[in-house]
A protein has these predicted regions:
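An N-terminal alpha-helical hairpin/helix-loop-helix interaction module that forms a charged
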Residues: 1-108, 123-206
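Short beta-strand-centered aromatic/proline hotspots
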Residues: 251-262
Length: 487
């Protein structure tokens, strides 16, 4: 969805809008900035208390940012050079080296606080980054307003991950100036206006678990039932998370369900995470029990005393053996989630992308009463710039009038989207086509499954409904999918 000047004007001139904008413009002390962090991201309290936040903000202002008070930045290039200099030269407080020169690993967790001070002095070029452990919310905002985010650097490149904040600054500078927002208005837009537009994720259609993963750590905060947790980047929404609580508990104590696909967060030290929910308490399985168990005594994770547990993949055999132990403790394992193994419909073979189209997708569309050149077309040529054309795989419910091509449903077929990176790349490709065709639904499919993304005011890479090909034997699921595509 494009930025709507009319809706923004209504917000900007409302009492709520004026208050939010003023909160970012009237920052006279660090406690005021601390309150902004706490208001717009309460999870910050999981890692930092108020005194710590104010102390870090004060240190960055007094010993890094304020020395540039007389500087007038004339361009993005100058601002980028200043930022790189600041993050590369460490932090000395009087005679104490608080942050070593070139310690980009440590700098990662401090970027949000530095960003607040840079925004205070050079608001034209820097925005306050408050998405601590909430990077998925930033991607949702970007998807909703059709903003293309920069490619996230590799996990091991800590400097590039620190510089990613500057890459975001450049993207949002273009968005802000293009839509006529002041720096303080943009901050209010990002943290107060936009979140009210983004629909809350509906997890009633949770996909079947495709995998299981081990995670670990003590469950604090009164035994919470949902939250942010380090995980494997290949975690998928609906997957099973087997929780090993570390010392002094030293036992597997519960299962969780991943609420979102694995999120790569460049500013999170461990890089990948998910949100956990739907907690299921199980009889405790102690480390001592596992070490004496015939199967788990030789398991590499058990032999390592669960060192490096977060994101460790659990095989189907691992999970089955856990079920055996839990059942032996008198627990009804039929109540526990099971890993789902997809299979192709009987008699179907798929060896490449074209097989997905011919043997799976087209028969499904035909069964729903939609046929090529009547209801859908393959490789619809779309004008995308002067002398350039692109060809989406399938356009369903289409209008191929030259220069005005449209399709209500955009379908991209792949052979195998084997990981989250492949799925995201396919989504972004389809998203770019959908914007040109004014599509309301995006469908991604491969040899295993069908992913349906509905616009609902704005697409989101994290909001989809998942079907397996064999689900189409179920009349309820078949008709549900048909209804989603019958727009």
């Amino acid at each position: 969805m494009k930025f709507n000047q009319y809706l923004w004007s209504l917000y900007k001139n409302s009492s709520e809008g004026k208050s939010a904008i003023a909160a970012f413009s009237d920052r006279k002390e660090w406690m005021t900035e601390e309150r902004l962090f706490e208001k717009y991201n309460p999870k910050i309290k999981d890692s930092f208390n108020s005194e710590m936040i104010c102390g870090i903000l004060e240190d960055f202002w007094c010993y890094k940012v304020s020395e540039h008070e007389g500087t007038e930045l004339q361009s993005l290039e100058e601002a980028g050079k200043l930022y790189e200099e600041i993050i590369s030269t460490g932090l000395m407080i009087e005679s104490e080296e608080v942050l070593k020169i070139g310690d980009f690993d440590r700098m990662l967790e401090l970027i949000p606080f530095l960003s607040m001070e840079l925004n205070y002095l050079f608001g034209e070029y820097f925005f306050p980054y408050i998405y601590i452990d909430e990077f998925c919310q930033l991607t949702r905002l970007a998807d909703y307003f059709e903003i293309e985010l920069p490619t996230i650097p590799k996990k091991s490149d800590y400097k590039a991950r620190c510089m990613y904040y500057w890459e975001l600054c450049k993207v949002f500078y273009k968005f802000r100036t293009g839509n006529g927002l002041s720096p303080d208005e943009f901050s209010a837009f990002m943290y107060d206006y936009a979140p009210n537009l983004l629909t809350k994720e509906d997890n009633t259609d949770m996909p079947k678990p495709s995998s299981a993963w081990f995670i670990g750590g003590l469950i604090r905060y009164g035994g919470r039932t949902t939250g942010f947790w380090q995980s494997n980047k290949e975690t998928k929404k609906g997957d099973i998370l087997i929780h090993y609580e570390t010392s002094p508990v030293s036992a597997i104590t519960c299962l969780w369900i991943a609420q979102v696909d694995g999120v790569i967060d460049p500013f999170f030290h461990y890089y990948s995470n998910t949100y956990i929910g739907d907690k299921i308490d199980i009889p405790h399985i102690s480390l001592k029990e596992l070490k004496s168990d015939e199967y788990f005594s030789d398991h590499p994770l058990v032999r390592k005393n669960f060192q490096g547990v977060n994101g460790w993949p659990a095989t189907g055999k691992d999970y089955a053996e856990l079920m055996r132990i839990i059942e032996a403790k008198g627990f009804d394992t039929s109540k526990l989630p099971q890993i789902y193994t997809p299979s192709l419909p009987e008699g179907i073979t798929v060896e490449n992308e074209r097989d997905v189209e011919v043997n799976l997708l087209e028969p499904l569309l035909n069964s729903m009463g939609w046929y090529e050149h009547k209801d859908y077309v393959r490789q619809l040529p779309i004008h995308a710039g002067r002398g350039h054309r692109i060809f989406p795989d399938y356009a369903l419910h289409y209008d191929n009038k030259p220069e005005e091509e449209k399709a209500k449903v955009l379908i991209e077929a792949k052979y195998h989207m084997k990981n989250n990176q492949k799925i995201e790349a396919a989504f972004l490709q389809a998203f770019s086509y959908a914007k040109l065709l004014l599509s309301s639904v995006i469908v991604l499919c491969d040899k295993e499954c069908i992913l349906v993304y509905e616009k609902n005011q704005g697409f989101s890479r994290d909001r989809y409904t998942k079907y397996y090909w064999e689900d189409m034997k179920d009349s309820d699921l078949y008709n549900e999918l048909k209804n989603r595509l019958s727009i």
